[in-house]
Design a protein with these regions (language model features):
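Acidic-and-aromatic substrate-binding clefts and catalytic sites of carbohydrate-active enzymes
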Residues: 74-77, 108-112, 285-291
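Aromatic (often tryptophan-rich) hydrophobic motifs at membrane interfaces
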Residues: 85-90, 206-319, 323
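Active-site/acyl-donor-binding loops of N-acyltransferases
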Residues: 2, 14, 27-28, 58, ...
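Short, high-confidence coil segments that cap the C-terminus of an alpha-helix
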Residues: 34-36, 96-99, 216, 271-274
Length: 349
């Protein structure tokens, strides 16, 4: 395919793109060792900007990664594989030396359709495990909060009635004591549910980095039982969408603050005129990442539509290095999650 690719500053990334393709996200990921490179891509019928993250995995060996990009909506299904291969080939000369593969986490395109694309050519390979969730639930906010609540299922309505009598939700105002109290709850949740927790430094970076607060901001919503913090969620806001990223809560018999936290975030997203609330993370197509099934029941209780996307896909620049990296990566994924079946694997993103 004919395309023209130029390096640009990360500040020139399109503000209309998903937050994962923004200068804000490049700054966040810098705190976990990824360096952001921005590009403009011009084709015959479209043009877009692209964020590529690069991380050194070993001496002289780096992985390049495109989070939720490039856009595919204007392509025919038969063109997607060729487009991804051509983009990887042409962008290689603009990436640092030593990059052994380009990893795509493609955007969500399919509404309630589990027949997603996979790829297996000499150099383009769909992976057994994905970096980011392959399924999500999105709620249309365009008609306002009251209209959204009409779509809540009875499970959510019952849980909210109980939670409203026991908990209060407030926005974190930036004080360290409240953040640390929530982080303790987060660590307890990680131990209980068996996931790998993010560091305090990384989670702070989500809330501190915002070069233009009118475009991308994140908020920590805290749930209180009296004066005690018993839960909280981090939600990322942009002009087009709000995305639930991280959450934690203590367990109570017959009651949960998680429903009240999500309802508060949905209300806040409506007040900010976001078009979509993304609950971010349910099992993928055809039973992939089935360990997220419990989350699907919770997230779909707020209504919305499930969306699916293709699994993570790598373009191989150096096949020998890639095979070595994939072996150790698979071992790490399974050991961190105690996963025996490859179909249930989903690493911490």
């Amino acid at each position: 395919m004919n395309m023209r690719i130029q390096r640009i500053a990360t500040s020139e990334l399109s503000p209309s793109s998903t937050v994962f393709q923004s200068s804000y996200w490049a700054g966040v990921k810098q705190h976990s060792g990824w360096k952001g490179y921005a590009f403009s891509v011009e084709m015959e019928s479209s043009a877009f900007t692209l964020l590529v993250l690069v991380k050194r995995m070993a001496p002289f060996c780096s992985l390049a990664y495109i989070p939720f990009g490039p856009p595919l909506s204007l392509l025919k299904l038969s063109q997607v594989g060729v487009f991804l291969e051509d983009l990887a080939k042409q962008i290689r000369k603009l990436l640092p030396k030593g990059v052994f593969a380009l990893r795509y986490d493609l955007p969500f395109e399919e509404v309630n359709d589990q027949n997603v694309m996979t790829f297996h050519t000499r150099r383009l390979r769909t992976l057994e495990q994905s970096v980011q969730p392959e399924g999500t639930v999105r709620i249309d906010l365009r008609w306002g909060y009251n209209a959204v609540t009409l779509g809540y299922r009875e499970r959510a309505k019952r849980a909210l009635r109980k939670a409203e009598q026991a908990f209060q939700v407030r926005v974190h105002e930036g004080d360290e004591a409240s953040f640390l109290a929530w982080y303790d709850v987060y660590l307890e949740t990680a131990r209980r549910d068996g996931f790998s927790p993010r560091s305090k430094k990384y989670l702070r970076s989500l809330m501190m980095l915002s070069p233009d607060e009118s475009v991308f901001t994140s908020q920590l919503l805290l749930a209180y039982e009296g004066k005690k913090i018993v839960g909280g969620i981090i939600v990322l806001f942009s002009p087009s969408e709000a995305i639930y990223l991280y959450g934690a809560s203590l367990r109570f018999d017959g009651i949960s603050c998680s429903y009240l936290l999500q309802d508060s975030a949905i209300r806040m997203a409506c007040e900010r005129k976001c078009g979509i609330y993304d609950l971010y993370g349910i099992p993928g197509p055809r039973g992939r990442a089935s360990h997220l099934a419990g989350l699907e029941i919770f997230k779909r209780s707020f209504g919305g539509q499930p969306y699916y996307r293709s699994p993570s896909t790598d373009y191989l620049y150096n096949r020998l290095t890639w095979h070595c990296y994939r072996f150790f990566e698979t071992v790490r994924f399974r050991s961190r999650r105690g996963i025996k079946s490859q179909a249930e694997a989903l690493p911490s993103s």
